[in-house]
């Protein structure tokens, strides 16, 4: 008998006479191995940092082939439950915020291609960063405000180089997201910007110069409001900024489509 021997099924009548019989989808062996190992990890049968049994031992325990074991371990790695290094047995790990968000990445990128998808994510970013600037205005330390000012300075030095400006723009907002000290906020923020930037249309560099300067000036207003410890002013400045960014990229996208 192995780990997957089935138990006797209930009588069909127990499900109700009105229900039609329909076949249940069969799970792959690798999925069954994955589920069992995941439960063992969550029950702390294997502690964080501890190595799992070898592939050969897992094959014997579950009575499955090597491909099923390897597929199961790969799935657990994607969930952040194990780390796999070449030549070593899988080692139990704890999922990070980045791991959790990365699991959503494929679905998010697909959703962005749907009608209204970008607008929905822009609204999500607006709601999210609105809370961040309010928090920053009320709680940011002098050191954190100094980091924002430094990011702003780098922003100003990148106005004539679009690639550098985008990086400095992302860095400015990253510093803002870092202020609460919550790693989940950071993971969400990084993912949101990655998804939205990837969905932006390709436009000539000359089209972006004016946009870069406008964004920089709006960043100044945001930082000034945070320095003044005025959450309402910071929130208004942030909303003005993100609405302006959204309108600019929508206009550039339409212009790009007409030129094709």
Curated annotation (Swiss-Prot):
DNA-binding span(s): 55-74
InterPro entries in UniProt: GntR_C, TF_FadR/GntR_C, Tscrpt_reg_HTH_GntR, Tscrpt_reg_NanR, WH-like_DNA-bd_sf, WH_DNA-bd_sf
PANTHER family: HTH-TYPE TRANSCRIPTIONAL REPRESSOR NANR (PTHR43537:SF53), TRANSCRIPTIONAL REGULATOR, GNTR FAMILY (PTHR43537)
Function: Transcriptional repressor that controls expression of the genes required for the catabolism of sialic acids.
Pfam families, per the entry: FCD, GntR
Superkingdom of origin: Bacteria
Residues of the HTH gntR-type domain: 27-95
Family: Belongs to the NanR family.
Gene3D superfamilies linked to this entry: GntR ligand-binding domain-like, Winged helix-like DNA-binding domain superfamily/Winged helix DNA-binding domain
Name listed for the protein in its UniProt record: HTH-type transcriptional repressor NanR
PROSITE patterns assigned to the protein according to its UniProt record, in alphabetical order: HTH_GNTR (PS50949)
Species for this entry: Salmonella newport (strain SL254)
GO BP terms in the entry: negative regulation of DNA-templated transcription
UniProt KW keywords: DNA-binding, Repressor, Transcription, Transcription regulation
Stretch list, region Disordered: 1-22
GO MF term (any one): DNA binding
